[in-house]
């Protein structure tokens, strides 16, 4: 799969929206996304749906397009939850996984045709976000994944934003704002993650990672940080080209706009944590543009 997932605000370094991330065994990386990545293999944060014929009806494809997301290769699939239950969902742009109802709730606020470093109005209200790392059954986070989640949360909290995270580990996820879990059992091929965009001032709840057992903790930290980014409203930094994945495809403005974030580049940012694809050489840290964007929005 080729997801890297992030939200309707193009890339932390530039946009907010939700999506997924995956690793591709090529010299280009994608997170639900980089031509300039030369270390290790490249992965996207989700399935390579852009290369797969869609299984959706025209009305649903039109709905996706109305949100300024790309309907190319969009797929209906089951989203498996940590307790083993599942629900119908739609995978868009490789690593954005949302139910049809969630998709319908996304608001359109206009958009820009500029390149990267943008934001939308789909943000999380100032709050403490309760986040749980799932530890039960076949979808439990491994020890390395738990450590990576701790590092990812620490990266966000040390910025002193008007959102912060309160992290616990366990199985009682129903009353938490966000749950991070290992869904490799239902994603046996590929490596990466997936998530969705915020709604109603709240973050997207479900953050999946999978196929990361052969990666070091820094790479896992990168994927988790990326997917959390989608969940609080960031879109892929290279949404306008998916260049990190070796592609030249515009993902669209994802319904909530694409407003340039002051102080960040308008072109390709090769080290942003919100690139669509990732490689085995990631360090899991925000770059300076990611931090600028986070501080501007939150």
Each model region followed by its residue ranges:
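C-terminal motif of bacterial Sec signal peptides marking the signal peptidase cleavage site
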Residues: 16-19
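Bacterial signal peptide processing site
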Residues: 21-24
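Disordered inhibitory propeptide/activation segment of secreted metzincin zinc metalloprotease zymogens
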Residues: 32-143, 259-262
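Zn2+-dependent metallopeptidase catalytic core
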Residues: 142-166
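Catalytic zinc-binding patch centered on the HExxH motif and its immediate surroundings
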Residues: 145, 173-204
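Surface-exposed patches in mature extracellular/periplasmic domains of secreted proteins
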Residues: 158-173, 236-243
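Active-site scaffold of zinc-dependent metalloenzymes
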Residues: 192-217, 273-276, 293-295
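The catalytic-center signature of Zn2+-dependent metalloproteases
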Residues: 218, 223-286
